[in-house]
Amino acid sequence: MNTRPTDKLAIAIAQLNSTVGDIAGNAEKARRARADAAHADLVVFPELFIAGYPPEDLVLKPAFQAGCRSAIETLARETASPGPALLVGTPWLDNGRLYNAVALLDGGDVSALRYKVDLPNYGVFDEKRVFASGPMPGPVNFRGVRLGIPICEDIWGAE
């Protein structure tokens, strides 16, 4: 973990293709990207990276939800070792509601979760059917820098 006091961050973008349903393979891609970006403070992954996109009805299966959560928790523990934090898209079950989420993994923990607010429901996108809309999130404090963490369409509008 890089802990230098600063108001700047080195961010690596992991523009990778995940495979729908291949939780273990997608988690391994995240590990390799973290190792490749050892110089960065944060590695950012695509929406729903752990599940693969679009996961459609697969995210409704409890075993799949549990597998995604387990992979995120394992990746979080791995951030206790030196290296960058991870910002990873994943389905996340919270109080009986399933969210399209992004998890900030740092210092060995899931240090923040943000849920997608603006769920699309057109063309191939059917997120309103499978995900709950999250509350409008505020920024997170990450290593002394305030970060907004919108997911996809959450950043498209003025609100």
Cite the ranges covered by each PLM segment:
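Enzyme catalytic cores with a strong preference for nitrogen-chemistry domains
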Residues: M1-E159
